[in-house]
Protein backbone atom coordinates (compact mmCIF):
# COMPACT_ATOMS: atom_id res chain seq x y z
CA UNK A 1 0.00 0.00 0.00
CA UNK A 2 1.14 3.54 -0.75
CA UNK A 3 -0.11 6.10 1.76
CA UNK A 4 0.78 9.68 2.65
CA UNK A 5 0.77 9.05 6.41
CA UNK A 6 -0.14 6.41 8.94
CA UNK A 7 -1.16 6.87 12.58
CA UNK A 8 -0.60 4.10 15.13
CA UNK A 9 -0.54 3.73 18.91
CA UNK A 10 -3.95 5.40 19.05
CA UNK A 11 -7.54 4.66 19.87
CA UNK A 12 -10.14 5.97 17.43
CA UNK A 13 -13.57 7.35 18.27
CA UNK A 14 -14.82 7.09 14.70
CA UNK A 15 -18.38 8.29 15.49
CA UNK A 16 -19.36 5.96 12.65
CA UNK A 17 -22.81 4.48 13.42
CA UNK A 18 -21.86 1.33 11.52
CA UNK A 19 -19.31 0.58 14.25
CA UNK A 20 -21.29 -0.96 17.10
CA UNK A 21 -19.11 0.16 20.02
CA UNK A 22 -19.90 3.40 21.89
CA UNK A 23 -18.41 6.38 20.05
CA UNK A 24 -17.73 4.01 17.16
CA UNK A 25 -14.60 3.20 19.13
CA UNK A 26 -11.71 1.15 17.80
CA UNK A 27 -9.16 0.30 20.49
CA UNK A 28 -5.50 0.00 19.49
CA UNK A 29 -6.31 1.33 16.07
CA UNK A 30 -4.48 2.55 13.00
CA UNK A 31 -5.47 5.19 10.49
CA UNK A 32 -4.03 5.81 7.02
CA UNK A 33 -4.32 8.94 4.88
CA UNK A 34 -4.01 9.31 1.11
CA UNK A 35 -4.65 12.42 -1.01
CA UNK A 36 -6.32 14.29 1.82
CA UNK A 37 -8.78 11.51 2.61
CA UNK A 38 -8.94 8.64 5.04
CA UNK A 39 -7.73 5.60 3.13
CA UNK A 40 -8.05 3.04 5.90
CA UNK A 41 -9.08 2.90 9.55
CA UNK A 42 -9.44 -0.14 11.79
CA UNK A 43 -7.70 -2.34 14.35
CA UNK A 44 -3.93 -2.02 14.12
CA UNK A 45 -3.53 -5.76 13.79
CA UNK A 46 -5.48 -5.66 10.52
CA UNK A 47 -3.51 -2.78 9.00
CA UNK A 48 -2.43 -3.75 5.46
CA UNK A 49 1.27 -3.82 4.74
CA UNK A 50 2.77 -0.53 3.58
CA UNK A 51 6.18 0.92 2.79
CA UNK A 52 7.43 1.83 6.25
CA UNK A 53 10.56 3.50 4.89
CA UNK A 54 8.74 6.02 2.68
CA UNK A 55 5.53 6.63 4.67
CA UNK A 56 5.47 9.19 7.52
CA UNK A 57 4.48 7.34 10.68
CA UNK A 58 2.82 9.18 13.57
CA UNK A 59 2.56 7.65 17.03
CA UNK A 60 -0.31 8.82 19.18
CA UNK A 61 1.14 7.63 22.51
CA UNK A 62 -2.13 5.95 23.43
CA UNK A 63 -4.27 9.03 22.88
CA UNK A 64 -7.61 9.23 21.12
CA UNK A 65 -8.36 10.37 17.60
CA UNK A 66 -11.79 11.84 16.86
CA UNK A 67 -13.26 13.50 13.80
CA UNK A 68 -12.48 17.20 13.57
CA UNK A 69 -15.08 19.15 15.53
CA UNK A 70 -17.80 21.02 13.65
CA UNK A 71 -19.36 24.20 15.04
CA UNK A 72 -22.58 24.37 13.05
CA UNK A 73 -23.99 27.66 14.39
CA UNK A 74 -21.90 30.81 14.89
CA UNK A 75 -22.13 34.54 14.28
CA UNK A 76 -18.40 35.13 14.59
CA UNK A 77 -18.02 37.95 12.05
CA UNK A 78 -19.01 41.09 13.94
CA UNK A 79 -17.56 44.32 15.34
CA UNK A 80 -17.88 45.84 18.79
CA UNK A 81 -19.05 44.13 21.96
CA UNK A 82 -21.97 44.34 24.34
CA UNK A 83 -20.36 44.17 27.77
CA UNK A 84 -22.59 47.05 28.90
CA UNK A 85 -25.66 44.95 28.18
CA UNK A 86 -24.13 42.12 30.16
CA UNK A 87 -24.11 44.41 33.16
CA UNK A 88 -27.72 45.46 32.53
CA UNK A 89 -28.85 41.84 32.41
CA UNK A 90 -27.13 41.15 35.70
CA UNK A 91 -29.12 44.06 37.12
CA UNK A 92 -32.37 42.45 36.01
CA UNK A 93 -33.06 43.54 32.42
CA UNK A 94 -34.18 40.75 30.10
CA UNK A 95 -32.80 39.98 26.64
CA UNK A 96 -36.18 40.95 25.19
CA UNK A 97 -36.28 44.27 27.11
CA UNK A 98 -32.82 45.21 25.89
CA UNK A 99 -33.74 44.34 22.31
CA UNK A 100 -36.94 46.40 22.40
CA UNK A 101 -35.04 49.44 23.76
CA UNK A 102 -32.72 49.50 20.75
CA UNK A 103 -29.94 47.45 22.23
CA UNK A 104 -29.13 43.86 21.49
CA UNK A 105 -28.65 43.01 17.86
CA UNK A 106 -29.16 46.62 16.75
CA UNK A 107 -26.14 47.89 18.69
CA UNK A 108 -23.96 45.34 16.92
CA UNK A 109 -25.54 46.30 13.60
CA UNK A 110 -24.33 49.87 14.08
CA UNK A 111 -20.77 48.68 14.77
CA UNK A 112 -20.78 46.35 11.76
CA UNK A 113 -22.09 49.01 9.41
CA UNK A 114 -19.19 51.25 10.44
CA UNK A 115 -16.46 48.58 10.28
CA UNK A 116 -14.37 47.89 7.18
CA UNK A 117 -14.03 44.46 5.61
CA UNK A 118 -10.39 44.39 6.71
CA UNK A 119 -11.34 45.10 10.32
CA UNK A 120 -14.05 42.46 10.29
CA UNK A 121 -11.70 39.94 8.69
CA UNK A 122 -9.08 40.39 11.40
CA UNK A 123 -11.66 40.08 14.17
CA UNK A 124 -13.10 36.96 12.55
CA UNK A 125 -9.67 35.45 12.01
CA UNK A 126 -8.82 35.69 15.71
CA UNK A 127 -12.07 34.00 16.67
CA UNK A 128 -11.64 31.30 14.06
CA UNK A 129 -8.13 30.66 15.38
CA UNK A 130 -9.54 30.18 18.88
CA UNK A 131 -11.98 27.53 17.66
CA UNK A 132 -9.32 25.86 15.52
CA UNK A 133 -7.02 25.43 18.52
CA UNK A 134 -9.77 23.38 20.15
CA UNK A 135 -10.02 21.00 17.23
CA UNK A 136 -12.66 22.67 15.07
CA UNK A 137 -12.11 21.92 11.37
CA UNK A 138 -15.48 23.05 9.97
CA UNK A 139 -17.55 26.04 11.05
CA UNK A 140 -20.73 27.78 9.97
CA UNK A 141 -20.74 31.61 9.96
CA UNK A 142 -23.95 33.63 9.70
CA UNK A 143 -24.46 37.22 8.63
CA UNK A 144 -27.31 39.12 10.27
CA UNK A 145 -25.54 42.11 11.80
CA UNK A 146 -25.96 44.32 8.75
CA UNK A 147 -29.70 44.47 8.14
CA UNK A 148 -29.06 46.45 4.98
CA UNK A 149 -27.91 45.09 1.66
CA UNK A 150 -24.41 46.57 1.67
CA UNK A 151 -23.50 45.39 5.16
CA UNK A 152 -25.04 41.94 4.82
CA UNK A 153 -22.97 41.42 1.68
CA UNK A 154 -19.91 42.76 3.49
CA UNK A 155 -20.29 40.27 6.34
CA UNK A 156 -20.76 37.35 3.96
CA UNK A 157 -17.77 38.40 1.86
CA UNK A 158 -15.63 38.42 4.99
CA UNK A 159 -16.89 34.97 5.97
CA UNK A 160 -16.09 33.64 2.50
CA UNK A 161 -12.61 35.20 2.65
CA UNK A 162 -11.98 33.58 6.02
CA UNK A 163 -12.74 30.24 4.42
CA UNK A 164 -10.28 30.94 1.62
CA UNK A 165 -7.43 32.01 3.91
CA UNK A 166 -7.88 29.66 6.87
CA UNK A 167 -7.53 25.89 7.07
CA UNK A 168 -10.95 25.61 8.73
CA UNK A 169 -13.74 24.94 6.23
CA UNK A 170 -16.33 27.72 6.39
CA UNK A 171 -20.00 27.33 5.46
CA UNK A 172 -21.83 30.65 5.17
CA UNK A 173 -25.44 31.43 6.01
CA UNK A 174 -27.37 34.55 5.00
CA UNK A 175 -29.35 35.79 8.00
CA UNK A 176 -30.68 39.09 6.70
CA UNK A 177 -33.93 38.41 8.57
CA UNK A 178 -32.21 38.42 11.95
CA UNK A 179 -33.92 41.50 13.39
CA UNK A 180 -35.96 44.46 12.26
CA UNK A 181 -33.69 47.45 11.56
CA UNK A 182 -34.69 50.80 13.09
CA UNK A 183 -35.44 52.30 9.69
CA UNK A 184 -38.10 49.61 9.13
CA UNK A 185 -39.59 49.42 12.64
CA UNK A 186 -42.98 50.55 11.30
CA UNK A 187 -42.77 48.56 8.06
CA UNK A 188 -41.74 44.99 8.78
CA UNK A 189 -43.33 43.71 5.58
CA UNK A 190 -41.31 46.24 3.66
CA UNK A 191 -38.13 44.90 5.22
CA UNK A 192 -39.10 41.32 4.39
CA UNK A 193 -39.62 42.47 0.81
CA UNK A 194 -36.11 43.97 0.86
CA UNK A 195 -34.62 40.71 2.14
CA UNK A 196 -36.36 38.66 -0.55
CA UNK A 197 -36.24 40.99 -3.54
CA UNK A 198 -32.93 42.81 -3.09
CA UNK A 199 -30.66 41.15 -0.53
CA UNK A 200 -31.20 37.52 -1.50
CA UNK A 201 -30.62 38.04 -5.25
CA UNK A 202 -27.46 40.02 -4.48
CA UNK A 203 -26.19 37.27 -2.18
CA UNK A 204 -26.86 34.66 -4.84
CA UNK A 205 -25.24 36.76 -7.58
CA UNK A 206 -21.95 36.80 -5.65
CA UNK A 207 -22.29 33.18 -4.45
CA UNK A 208 -21.91 34.30 -0.86
CA UNK A 209 -24.19 31.87 0.98
CA UNK A 210 -24.69 28.14 1.31
CA UNK A 211 -27.89 28.53 3.32
CA UNK A 212 -30.48 31.04 4.53
CA UNK A 213 -31.69 31.48 8.10
CA UNK A 214 -34.41 33.55 9.80
CA UNK A 215 -35.05 34.50 13.43
CA UNK A 216 -38.67 33.48 13.95
CA UNK A 217 -39.81 34.99 17.24
CA UNK A 218 -42.15 37.59 18.74
CA UNK A 219 -39.37 40.20 18.76
CA UNK A 220 -38.37 39.43 15.18
CA UNK A 221 -40.33 37.78 12.33
CA UNK A 222 -43.66 35.96 12.49
CA UNK A 223 -44.49 32.64 10.87
CA UNK A 224 -45.84 34.10 7.64
CA UNK A 225 -42.86 36.42 7.15
CA UNK A 226 -40.43 33.65 7.98
CA UNK A 227 -42.06 31.25 5.54
CA UNK A 228 -41.84 33.84 2.77
CA UNK A 229 -38.08 34.21 3.23
CA UNK A 230 -37.40 30.49 3.57
CA UNK A 231 -39.54 29.62 0.55
CA UNK A 232 -37.70 32.18 -1.58
CA UNK A 233 -34.37 30.75 -0.46
CA UNK A 234 -35.45 27.18 -1.13
CA UNK A 235 -36.76 28.12 -4.56
CA UNK A 236 -33.33 29.64 -5.27
CA UNK A 237 -31.66 26.33 -4.46
CA UNK A 238 -30.18 27.25 -1.09
CA UNK A 239 -30.38 25.18 2.08
CA UNK A 240 -32.63 26.59 4.77
CA UNK A 241 -32.51 26.64 8.56
CA UNK A 242 -34.20 28.54 11.35
CA UNK A 243 -33.77 30.18 14.73
CA UNK A 244 -36.97 28.92 16.34
CA UNK A 245 -38.77 28.44 19.64
CA UNK A 246 -36.08 30.21 21.67
CA UNK A 247 -38.36 32.52 23.65
CA UNK A 248 -41.81 31.12 22.83
CA UNK A 249 -43.50 28.47 20.71
CA UNK A 250 -44.69 30.04 17.47
CA UNK A 251 -44.61 26.80 15.49
CA UNK A 252 -41.66 27.85 13.38
CA UNK A 253 -39.97 24.48 13.68
CA UNK A 254 -42.96 22.63 12.24
CA UNK A 255 -43.17 25.05 9.34
CA UNK A 256 -39.41 24.82 8.65
CA UNK A 257 -39.51 21.03 8.82
CA UNK A 258 -42.27 20.92 6.22
CA UNK A 259 -40.06 23.03 3.95
CA UNK A 260 -37.17 20.60 4.43
CA UNK A 261 -34.93 22.70 6.66
CA UNK A 262 -31.51 21.28 7.49
CA UNK A 263 -31.86 22.37 11.10
CA UNK A 264 -33.89 24.35 13.58
CA UNK A 265 -31.85 25.99 16.30
CA UNK A 266 -32.39 26.97 19.97
CA UNK A 267 -35.80 25.18 20.35
CA UNK A 268 -36.14 25.62 24.12
CA UNK A 269 -39.93 25.93 23.73
CA UNK A 270 -40.38 23.20 21.11
CA UNK A 271 -43.34 20.89 21.82
CA UNK A 272 -43.88 17.25 20.87
CA UNK A 273 -45.77 18.08 17.69
CA UNK A 274 -42.76 20.07 16.56
CA UNK A 275 -40.40 17.26 17.50
CA UNK A 276 -42.46 14.80 15.47
CA UNK A 277 -42.32 17.16 12.49
CA UNK A 278 -38.52 17.27 12.75
CA UNK A 279 -38.35 13.50 12.94
CA UNK A 280 -40.49 13.03 9.84
CA UNK A 281 -38.46 15.49 7.77
CA UNK A 282 -35.01 14.46 8.97
CA UNK A 283 -34.37 17.98 10.23
CA UNK A 284 -31.68 18.35 12.89
CA UNK A 285 -32.27 20.00 16.25
CA UNK A 286 -29.41 22.35 17.12
CA UNK A 287 -28.90 22.89 20.84
CA UNK A 288 -27.16 26.07 21.95
CA UNK A 289 -26.24 25.76 25.63
CA UNK A 290 -24.02 28.84 25.57
CA UNK A 291 -27.00 31.14 25.00
CA UNK A 292 -29.09 29.19 27.52
CA UNK A 293 -26.33 29.67 30.10
CA UNK A 294 -25.44 33.27 29.31
CA UNK A 295 -29.06 34.46 29.30
CA UNK A 296 -29.73 32.44 32.47
CA UNK A 297 -32.70 30.73 30.85
CA UNK A 298 -34.68 28.07 32.67
CA UNK A 299 -36.72 26.47 29.86
CA UNK A 300 -34.70 23.51 28.62
CA UNK A 301 -34.98 22.05 25.12
CA UNK A 302 -37.09 18.85 25.07
CA UNK A 303 -34.13 16.46 25.12
CA UNK A 304 -36.15 13.38 26.09
CA UNK A 305 -38.63 13.98 23.27
CA UNK A 306 -35.81 14.45 20.77
CA UNK A 307 -34.38 11.11 21.90
CA UNK A 308 -37.78 9.44 21.80
CA UNK A 309 -38.38 10.49 18.19
CA UNK A 310 -34.74 9.97 17.14
CA UNK A 311 -34.13 13.54 16.00
CA UNK A 312 -30.40 14.16 15.36
CA UNK A 313 -29.17 16.53 18.06
CA UNK A 314 -26.50 19.06 17.12
CA UNK A 315 -24.42 21.00 19.64
CA UNK A 316 -23.00 24.40 18.69
CA UNK A 317 -21.48 27.48 20.29
CA UNK A 318 -23.81 30.16 18.86
CA UNK A 319 -20.79 32.41 19.32
CA UNK A 320 -22.06 35.99 19.15
CA UNK A 321 -21.62 39.25 21.08
CA UNK A 322 -24.99 39.38 22.78
CA UNK A 323 -26.27 36.03 23.96
CA UNK A 324 -23.28 33.68 23.73
CA UNK A 325 -19.89 35.46 23.71
CA UNK A 326 -18.28 32.10 24.42
CA UNK A 327 -15.82 31.15 21.69
CA UNK A 328 -15.21 27.57 22.78
CA UNK A 329 -16.59 24.39 21.30
CA UNK A 330 -15.11 22.28 24.10
CA UNK A 331 -17.00 24.37 26.64
CA UNK A 332 -20.19 23.57 24.72
CA UNK A 333 -19.49 19.85 25.06
CA UNK A 334 -19.39 20.29 28.82
CA UNK A 335 -22.45 22.55 28.91
CA UNK A 336 -24.41 20.20 26.69
CA UNK A 337 -23.95 17.53 29.32
CA UNK A 338 -24.22 19.59 32.51
CA UNK A 339 -27.06 21.90 31.43
CA UNK A 340 -29.02 19.76 28.96
CA UNK A 341 -28.17 16.32 30.35
CA UNK A 342 -26.77 14.97 27.11
CA UNK A 343 -24.51 11.97 27.44
CA UNK A 344 -20.87 12.65 26.48
CA UNK A 345 -21.40 10.47 23.41
CA UNK A 346 -24.48 12.47 22.37
CA UNK A 347 -22.53 15.68 22.88
CA UNK A 348 -19.62 14.52 20.72
CA UNK A 349 -22.01 13.27 18.03
CA UNK A 350 -23.58 16.72 18.15
CA UNK A 351 -20.27 18.31 17.22
CA UNK A 352 -19.26 15.73 14.63
CA UNK A 353 -21.67 13.41 12.80
CA UNK A 354 -24.89 15.32 13.45
CA UNK A 355 -23.30 18.74 12.94
CA UNK A 356 -22.15 17.59 9.52
CA UNK A 357 -25.72 16.60 8.67
CA UNK A 358 -26.99 20.01 9.76
CA UNK A 359 -24.58 21.66 7.32
CA UNK A 360 -25.25 19.20 4.51
CA UNK A 361 -21.68 17.86 4.48
CA UNK A 362 -22.26 14.46 6.09
CA UNK A 363 -20.82 12.78 3.00
CA UNK A 364 -17.46 14.49 3.62
CA UNK A 365 -16.87 15.01 7.34
CA UNK A 366 -18.19 14.10 10.77
CA UNK A 367 -17.09 10.46 10.97
CA UNK A 368 -13.81 8.65 10.50
CA UNK A 369 -14.27 6.15 7.69
CA UNK A 370 -12.55 5.32 4.43
CA UNK A 371 -13.28 7.93 1.78
CA UNK A 372 -14.06 10.77 4.18
CA UNK A 373 -11.96 13.92 4.42
CA UNK A 374 -8.92 13.41 6.62
CA UNK A 375 -10.09 15.91 9.23
CA UNK A 376 -9.26 14.63 12.69
CA UNK A 377 -7.78 15.50 16.07
CA UNK A 378 -5.47 13.71 18.48
CA UNK A 379 -6.43 14.22 22.12
CA UNK A 380 -4.50 13.57 25.32
CA UNK A 381 -7.37 11.72 26.97
CA UNK A 382 -7.99 8.23 28.31
CA UNK A 383 -11.63 8.08 27.18
CA UNK A 384 -13.72 10.22 24.79
CA UNK A 385 -15.97 11.21 27.69
CA UNK A 386 -13.13 13.39 28.98
CA UNK A 387 -13.79 15.89 26.20
CA UNK A 388 -17.08 16.79 27.86
CA UNK A 389 -16.08 16.02 31.44
CA UNK A 390 -13.08 18.33 31.83
CA UNK A 391 -12.40 21.77 30.40
CA UNK A 392 -9.44 24.10 30.00
CA UNK A 393 -6.46 21.75 30.26
CA UNK A 394 -5.31 21.85 26.62
CA UNK A 395 -5.98 18.27 25.63
CA UNK A 396 -5.92 18.90 21.86
CA UNK A 397 -2.47 17.71 20.84
CA UNK A 398 -2.68 17.73 17.05
CA UNK A 399 -5.15 18.66 14.33
CA UNK A 400 -5.08 17.23 10.82
CA UNK A 401 -7.07 19.01 8.08
CA UNK A 402 -7.38 17.46 4.64
CA UNK A 403 -4.45 15.23 5.53
CA UNK A 404 -2.18 18.10 6.59
CA UNK A 405 -0.96 18.66 10.13
CA UNK A 406 -2.14 22.18 10.98
CA UNK A 407 -1.80 22.33 14.78
CA UNK A 408 0.81 20.63 16.94
UniProtKB/Swiss-Prot annotation:
Class of enzymatic activity (EC top level): hydrolase
Record GO biological process: L-histidine catabolic process to glutamate and formamide; L-histidine catabolic process to glutamate and formate
Cofactor note: Binds 1 zinc or iron ion per subunit.
Binding-site positions, Zn(2+): 73, 75, 243, 318
Binding site for Fe(3+): 73, 75, 243, 318
Keyword tRNA-binding: no
Chain positions recorded as 4-imidazolone-5-propanoate binding sites: 82, 145, 178, 246, 323
Pathway: Amino-acid degradation; L-histidine degradation into L-glutamate; N-formimidoyl-L-glutamate from L-histidine: step 3/3
Pfam families listed in its UniProt record: Amidohydro_1 (PF01979)
Record's catalysed reaction(s): 4-imidazolone-5-propanoate + H2O = N-formimidoyl-L-glutamate
Known EC number: 3.5.2.7
CC terms in the record's Gene Ontology section: cytoplasm
Subcellular location: Cytoplasm
Principal subcellular localization: cytoplasm
CDD domains: Imidazolone-5PH
Keyword annotations from UniProtKB, A to Z: Cytoplasm, Histidine metabolism, Hydrolase, Iron, Metal-binding, Zinc
GO MF annotation list: imidazolonepropionase activity; iron ion binding; zinc ion binding
Binding-site residues, N-formimidoyl-L-glutamate: 145, 320, 322
NCBIfam families, sorted: hutI (TIGR01224)
Function comment: Catalyzes the hydrolytic cleavage of the carbon-nitrogen bond in imidazolone-5-propanoate to yield N-formimidoyl-L-glutamate. It is the third step in the universal histidine degradation pathway.
PANTHER family: IMIDAZOLONEPROPIONASE, IMIDAZOLONEPROPIONASE-RELATED
Family statement: Belongs to the metallo-dependent hydrolases superfamily. HutI family.
Protein name: Imidazolonepropionase
Species per Swiss-Prot/TrEMBL record: Shewanella woodyi (strain ATCC 51908 / MS32)
Lineage, broadest ranks: Bacteria, Pseudomonadati, Pseudomonadota, Gammaproteobacteria, Alteromonadales
Amino acid sequence: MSWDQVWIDVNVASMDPSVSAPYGAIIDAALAVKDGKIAWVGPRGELPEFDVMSTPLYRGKGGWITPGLIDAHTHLVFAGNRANEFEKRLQGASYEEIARSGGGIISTVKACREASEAELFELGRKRLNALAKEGVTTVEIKSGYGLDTATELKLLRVARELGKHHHVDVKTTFLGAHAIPPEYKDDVEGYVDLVINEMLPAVIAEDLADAVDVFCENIAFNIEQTERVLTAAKDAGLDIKLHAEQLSNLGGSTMAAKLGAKSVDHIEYLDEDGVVALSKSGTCATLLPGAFYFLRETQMPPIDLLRKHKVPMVLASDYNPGSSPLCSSLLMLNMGCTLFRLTPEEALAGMTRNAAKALGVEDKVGVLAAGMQADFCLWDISTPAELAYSYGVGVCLEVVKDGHLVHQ
